[in-house]
């Protein structure tokens, strides 16, 4: 297992809503934690989803997001955080039209062999489909 992870070794993956930097994942030797650097592009958002069997902590490092946990929402700015209980539906949106929002995300336990990240998209189901329309 690697104890030190230089930024140059963090695998980055592009999505239509932003970027995930896979900082600590099973393929790097992690057995219980998943740590991600997340960039939400202006106007981007990670639509409603859940992580079966995983808890999550989101920390806003820079920028502002609208964070949903269940049907509740809050505006979070740098230094704020949100805890998402195991399997809870949630979503993160960057409503700013100019500034990227930077987040640190920690999940536990790790699931699967590659990223350790399990996801079930529920954005096409009610009430989630109508919540931000």
Task: Place the predicted regions along the sequence by residue.
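Short beta-strand His + acidic residue motifs that chelate non-heme Fe in jelly-roll/DSBH
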Residues: 48-49, 67-68, 84, 90-97
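Short histidine-centered beta-strand/loop micro-motifs
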Residues: 25-27, 47-52, 93-95, 121
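A cytosolic small-molecule/anion-sensing beta-strand core signal
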Residues: 36, 61-62, 77-78
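Conserved short histidine dyad/triad with adjacent acidic residue
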Residues: 21, 36-51
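Double-stranded beta-helix
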Residues: 3-4, 11-18, 30, 34, ...
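Short acidic-glycine-tyrosine-enriched beta hairpin
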Residues: 71-86
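Glycine- and acidic-residue-biased ligand/ion/polar-headgroup-sensing regions
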Residues: 53-55, 59-65
């Amino acid at each position: 297992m690697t104890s030190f992870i230089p930024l140059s070794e963090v695998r980055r993956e592009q999505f239509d809503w932003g970027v995930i930097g896979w900082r600590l994942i099973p393929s790097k030797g992690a057995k219980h934690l998943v740590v991600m650097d997340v960039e939400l592009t202006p106007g981007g958002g990670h639509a409603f989803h859940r992580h079966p069997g995983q808890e999550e902590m989101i920390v806003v490092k820079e920028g502002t997001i609208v964070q949903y946990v269940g049907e509740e929402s809050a505006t979070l700015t740098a230094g704020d955080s949100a805890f998402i209980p195991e399997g809870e539906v949630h979503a993160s949106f960057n409503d700013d039209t100019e500034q990227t929002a930077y987040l640190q995300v920690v999940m536990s336990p790790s699931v699967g062999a590659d990223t350790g990240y399990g996801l079930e998209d529920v954005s096409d189901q009610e009430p989630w489909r109508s919540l931000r329309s």
